[in-house]
């Protein structure tokens, strides 16, 4: 079952970098799809009742949150603002604009209880897809040494 996809056509204002950004978003969707994160989100039963307003697509909401964190927009208000004004987020969310309260409820109800399972699956998929070697640990491009700053 395909959880992370965009089936609708979307009018994007022609920008020089729009094709590259769409490719990045589709790569994000591919990684999320291959990781099996959709099954975890589905098992969380987010907003499963039919009472009230129609719920946002939880898979696309998760992809939007991940994309915002990748763009260093980590606060709820920044995520809400990006969802409202950023074309990339409008592409991901099919032009829906969730409020910061909706994003907060989704993070508290779905992401936080399942954070270890979600992010371990995503990490394993990224390692497998890009053939990364995780034997050596690097932080900010500097190899960690056992005797760092030890002068003889």
Predicted regions and their residues:
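Short amphipathic alpha-helical "interface-anchor" segments enriched in bulky aromatics
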Residues: 28-32, 83, 139
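Basic, short loop/linker segments at the boundary and entry of helix-turn-helix/winged-helix-like folds
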Residues: 20-66
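Hydrophobic alpha-helical scaffolding
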Residues: 14-18, 54, 112
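Short, aromatic/basic-rich helix-turn unit that serves as a nucleic-acid recognition element
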Residues: 69
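Hydrophobic alpha-helical membrane-insertion signals
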Residues: 1-26
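Active-site- or DNA-interface-adjacent structural scaffold in DNA-acting proteins
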Residues: 93-152
């Amino acid at each position: 079952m395909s959880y992370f996809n965009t089936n609708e056509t979307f009018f994007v204002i022609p920008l020089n970098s729009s094709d590259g950004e769409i490719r990045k978003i589709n790569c994000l969707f591919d990684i999320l799809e291959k990781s099996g994160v959709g099954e975890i989100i589905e098992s969380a039963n987010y907003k499963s009742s039919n009472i009230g307003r129609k719920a946002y697509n939880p898979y696309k909401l998760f992809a939007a949150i991940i994309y915002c964190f990748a763009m260093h927009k980590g606060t709820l208000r920044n995520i809400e603002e990006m969802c409202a004004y950023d074309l990339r987020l409008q592409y991901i969310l099919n032009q829906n604009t969730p409020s910061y309260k909706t994003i907060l409820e989704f993070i508290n109800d779905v992401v936080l209880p399942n954070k270890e399972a979600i992010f371990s699956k995503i990490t394993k998929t990224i390692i497998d897809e890009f053939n990364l070697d995780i034997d050596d640990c690097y932080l900010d491009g500097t190899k960690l040494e056992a005797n760092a700053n030890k002068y003889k």
